[in-house]
Amino acid sequence: MTDKITFNDLGLPEFILKAVSDLGFETPSPIQQSCIPHLLNGNDVLGMAQTGSGKTAAFALPLLAQIDPSEKHPQMLVMAPTRELAIQVADACELFVKYAQGTRIVTLYGGQRYDIQLRALKQGAQVVVGTPGRILDHIRRGTLNLSELRFIVLDEADEMLRMGFIDDVETVMAELPENHQTALFSATMPEPIRRITKRFMNDPQEVKIKVNNENAPDIDQSCWYVHGVRKNEALLRFLEVEDFDAAIIFARTKTGTLDITELLEKNGFRSAALNGDMTQQLREQTLDRLRNGSLDIVVATDVAARGIDIERISLVVNYDIPLDAESYVHRIGRTGRAGRSGRALLFVEPRERRLLRNIEHLMKKGINEVELPNHLVLQECRRKKFVAKITKQLEHHDLEQYRSLLEDLFTADQDQENIAAAMLMLLQGKQKLILPPDPPMEKRRRERNDRGDRRENPRSAERRGERKGYGNPQPMDLYRIEVGRADGVEVRHIVGAIANEGDINSRYIGHIKLYDDYTTVELPQGMPKELLQQFAKTRVLNKQMQMSFLGAVKSDNSRGSDDFNGKRKGRGGDFRGERGRERGNDNRGNRKFNEKSNRTFSDKPRRDRRSSF
């Protein structure tokens, strides 16, 4: 039996090994073991691995080891899809170079003031980490000179493609000097990413790491079919009976995050909203409060939650089901980190069962249904908490003055048990310890395509035209938007408004056709009513969309298809399919990232309970 390989065996310099040792790690993860020697030897690397595999250290350790601190210009560039990931990578790099005198790291992302970034660049940062949009802005402004760059890393390349940043990535790559080393990491390898590897990489060494199910996050998943009570009441019930440290609740819209937060605060939960309207400073303050325990719940949209990596989160509630299955996977990945177990709860409206089936199909496993906690469950939970509260108070030794008060009460010729019961009634506050029975509810009718012991003919899904993967057709509805060419609108404006306001992956937006006074757009069937109401108020170029339903799309051929390049192919001559730039300048970073932590080296170094790297 061969001995385990350690970081000391990989050829890393002493100052890097010392930093790694300080972090408490000895054994490299599979991707680190494979990539580090290649990058130290000057080879380009194409890494295919899921998040949580330790790829940040896989590229950062060998490349940082080769930085020359005496050269005060950018030598290493890391592009990440979100500002959260960029910050995490930069933080990790800071830890890795703690013993490298003179190595400076700067982070460039939208939402942060330019003067802060300019000051860091002028101080001679050798390592630049940022989002594609802000990096390209600095290049065009002449404030970022990459003429002497030695290393470039594309982290989460498929995410940058999915978010529409691939054009910016290629533009930046074209600016680099001829002799540089490239490392590209991606969980999947769609054709546009392959194209980049062929165009910009020199005989890359491919490293493929399979997910180790033994190290997969321990997440207990369940769903509740919305029935009998409103989601708000159900949410309060579930939160009351769930045993969680911290929780994140996902809503589909910014307005939803505010409404849910207001509901929770009124009912005694320490909560805060997290959405795209927040400044970066306020966002970071909110996440810091969640980390240090002064906040227990954040209510977030998918966009705002990207990049959250907080060990305390042990519960994820999908208040609104995501319209694409991949978003669900990334949502629940916020819990079950660092070897801890987690819970994920999904609310499913009657019209959303198809979306649930899509999620189960992607995950290759079913999600068990859970019953709404009834009055007996709530009552028992409240009583246990109340008894625990009283027991804890009895441990204090400063109760003597209250004993004298009891003596006064007992001499009032009142039964002691009645006095104690009256005290309990006063102490219970708003959360009553004795609850009336729930009103009877009609039994939920199981539909033909509902869950359980259904046996579905495989051809039935084909007849429904459901989407089986990227680029496959799915049932669509046609909508009209009261904004058109005369208003100066372009397809990218429509896509951006729908994708950002509804947190909808742009690939799930169908054929868009522009007319002079209005626009038609195809969206997946089963869109929640609340979301459509939100779209009606959404503004495009400062004009309300006033979205209205026209009917179901009758033929798949009438609908555009999409490829991984984000380009739409439709029959209408008025349809312009370029999707490469459907975003605002300063919000590029506020996108999607999910770093699942495992017991090897997760991408965000931790300071506790480490056994391996």
Swiss-Prot record:
It comes from the Bacteria. GO terms for molecular function: ATP binding; ATP hydrolysis activity; RNA helicase activity; RNA strand annealing activity. Its EC number is 3.6.4.13. Residues 440-469, 556-613 have a biased composition (Basic and acidic residues). ATP binds at A49, Q50, T51, G52, S53, G54, K55, T56. GO terms for biological process: cellular response to cold; response to cold; ribosomal large subunit assembly; RNA catabolic process. Keywords: ATP-binding, Cytoplasm, Helicase, Hydrolase, Nucleotide-binding, RNA-binding, Stress response. InterPro entries: CsdA_RRM, DbpA/CsdA_RNA-bd_dom, DEAD/DEAH_box_helicase_dom, DEAD_box_RNA_helicases, DEAD_helicase_DeaD, Helicase_ATP-bd, Helicase_C-like, Nucleotide-bd_a/b_plait_sf. It holds the Pfam family DbpA. It is found in: Cytoplasm. SUPFAM superfamilies: P-loop containing nucleoside triphosphate hydrolases. A motif (DEAD box) lies at residues 155-158. Residues 36-207 form the Helicase ATP-binding domain. GO terms for cellular component: cytosol. Residues 231-378 form the Helicase C-terminal domain. Residues 434-476, 552-613 are annotated as: Disordered. A motif (Q motif) lies at residues 5-33. It catalyses: ATP + H2O = ADP + phosphate + H(+). Disulfide bonds: none annotated. Belongs to the DEAD box helicase family. DeaD/CsdA subfamily. DEAD-box RNA helicase involved in various cellular processes at low temperature, including ribosome biogenesis, mRNA degradation and translation initiation. This is ATP-dependent RNA helicase DeaD. It comes from Haemophilus influenzae (strain ATCC 51907 / DSM 11121 / KW20 / Rd).
